[in-house]
Curated annotation (Swiss-Prot):
Location of region: Condensation: 124-434
Residue positions, PTM O-(pantetheine 4'-phosphoryl)serine: S35
Group of enzyme by EC: ligase
Protein name listed in UniProt: Nonribosomal peptide synthetase ALT12
Family according to the record: Belongs to the NRP synthetase family.
Pathway: Mycotoxin biosynthesis
Carrier domain span: 1-76
Length: 554
């Protein structure tokens, strides 16, 4: 059982603060945590080995070290039922008798559509474990991948060792054995739909290029191939462009992963390097399969409920806060960029005791900057949601797959007299109240056949995730792998976009790495500079000041 001091160290690492600065009764959000980005997920991921089930919404609103520790303590005293990783099912919402009886059975559907998909994939029936529909998000990325408009996601590691080729092959074999996403194929059905197929074994491709940069460039334009593994590996030995260093790359299509998957993959590899035999044991059950998650969401009609909610949410919204609607562009290029480091809020509370959470500050600052650019006082933009707020699907925080979704975020700036602390609290309430509707496609995010306009900017918040260390603790030259360090700084990723602006923000302790990418035909360079400068000024004002909304609006 983890001690309170150990819990403080985990919180300190996730939040980027010293453990002795954390009080037992201080709230996670007030300390700088968030429920939109990944800090809360990282924290719950760190304690996942204790098998504790905690509702994310409750935790981010009221969670303290004391309450989390008590929940973990309580879990240890109960008999926690373990299930096969391919069939994790509902937890907090409960299972009915039929669901419970069939929860641990892996089934193959026998419809004509699925038979066709298996035939096209040239799969041996005995190798097929399960077939499931794809999610709307998977469908979106699949369409882009098949058209060559989006490439692979690359997870890059710098590696050293006496036998990297065989050592890494062993690592990937273990990784595939416990993580179903690595053994998931996508194939077409008779009605021109698609299904995902979980297989017992797969043969992912290995590449041995001499130049890391050229390999990454190739993956960025690589098309999705139906019926083929969506994962491939590369080992680059003694890359001349990087002072002779060695690199290992896991490349995955976006149909199978998201930003949080990088953290999860790092955690899995850390466990493998620490003890391969312990990781391989049968008691270390498979992680949940994304296909079963899709079935669960469909069974609960989550997508349908979300669509109804977002339809009502967007009623009356004016989305033209960057350019006139008639100038909308499909699959445009981000040919402009402003990249800068901005000091993040250091003090989580100011003189009046009001919290200053970085997520609240960023979203409020972006809304105000767009209001100043457009003259509108009802602002809507797209916001990346991590997709793992609900605890209705067991062990969702260890689930690899494209759960991240883009949803509308709407901020009213009508009242000039509203104090900044009240605005920030309203932002937090909006985050919390809409978390339950984070699944399914909402209107006004992507171009649609009904001709509705879509949001003109997207905000993507990323936290610094500590997924793994430097590899094995033993520093022996005789180890097959003696060093393995994540190198996300080497990754480049490009995609076509119909949004005029992509605001990507990565928080490293007390600094924001802000990257604002924009399409010059939709946002002129001069206006882009003004928008960014206004956003930066609003961050500073909201972080420390007592301004009213009217004082921040030009």
């Amino acid at each position: 059982m983890a001690s309170l001091e150990h819990m403080k160290r985990i919180w300190g690492e996730v939040l980027g603060i010293e453990p002795d600065e954390i009080g037992l009764d201080e709230n996670f959000v007030d300390l700088g945590g968030d429920s939109v980005g990944t800090k809360a997920l990282q924290l719950l991921g760190e304690v996942a080995s204790y098998n504790v089930q905690i509702d994310l919404e409750t935790f981010t609103n009221t969670g303290t070290i004391q309450t989390l520790w008590e929940a973990m303590n309580d879990t240890q005293t109960r008999n926690v039922h373990s299930m096969d990783g391919r069939d994790y099912n509902t937890d907090s919402e409960g299972l009915d008798v039929v669901e419970a009886a069939s929860a641990s059975i892996v089934t193959k559907t026998d419809t004509d559509n699925d038979d066709l998909a298996l035939e096209q994939a040239r799969l041996v029936q005995d190798n097929v474990l399960c077939v499931a529909p794809i999610s709307p998000v998977q469908g979106f990325f699949l369409d882009l991948g098949l058209a060559g408009q989006i490439g692979l996601i690359n997870y890059i590691f710098e590696v050293e060792g006496s036998d990297l080729k065989h050592g890494l092959a062993h690592v990937t074999n273990l990784l595939e054995s416990k993580n179903p996403v690595f053994r998931t194929l996508i194939e077409k059905t008779k009605e021109s739909g698609f299904v995902q197929i979980l297989v017992a074994k797969t043969r992912s491709s290995w590449f041995y290029p001499s130049d890391l940069r050229l390999y990454l460039e190739k993956t960025m334009t690589q098309k999705f191939e139906l019926g083929k593994p969506a994962v491939q590996y590369a080992l680059v030995m003694e890359d001349a462009a990087h002072e002779g260093r060695n690199f290992f790359v896991i490349s995955m299509h976006h149909t199978h992963c998201d930003a949080f998957s990088r953290f999860l993959i790092g955690k899995e590899i850390s466990q493998i390097l620490e003890s391969p035999s312990y990781y391989a044991r049968s008691e270390n059950i498979e992680r949940p399969w994304f296909g079963n998650y899709v079935k669960h969401v469909q069974q609960k009609a989550t997508d349908d409920k979300a669509s109804l909610f977002w339809d009502a949410y967007m009623c009356g919204a004016n989305l033209a806060n960057i350019y006139p609607l008639h100038r909308a562009t499909l699959n445009g290029e981000f040919d402009g960029a402003i990249i800068e480091k901005i000091q993040a809020p250091v003090a989580t509370r100011i003189a009046d005791g009001s919290p200053r959470n970085s997520t609240q500050v960023i979203l409020a600052a972006w809304a105000i900057a767009l209001a100043n650019l457009s003259g509108l006082r009802d602002i809507t933009f797209g916001l990346c949601r991590h997709g793992r707020s609900s605890s209705s699907f067991r062990d969702v925080r260890r689930l690899m797959g494209p759960l991240v979704n883009v949803l509308p975020f709407r901020v009213s700036l009508i009242c000039n007299e509203e104090p900044a602390p009240a605005l920030l609290q309203r932002i937090q309430n909006e985050i919390t109240s809409t978390n339950k509707h984070e699944h399914g496609f909402s209107p006004c995010i992507f171009p649609s056949t009904d001709g509705r306009p879509w949001v003109q900017s997207l905000v993507d918040l990323k936290s610094e995730l500590h997924g793994m260390g430097n590899g094995p603790s033993a520093r022996s030259d005789h180890l097959a792998i003696s060093k393995m360090v994540p190198r996300p700084d080497l990754d480049t990723y490009e995609m076509k976009s119909h949004w005029a602006v992509l605001l990507s923000i990565r928080q490293h302790r007390n600094v924001f790495q802000v990257s604002m990418y924009y399409q010059k035909p939709l946002l002129a360079e001069g206006k882009a500079v003004v928008l960014f400068e206004n956003f930066r000024a609003c961050i500073q004002a909201l972080s420390t000041g007592q301004n009213s909304v009217g004082e921040l609006l030009e």
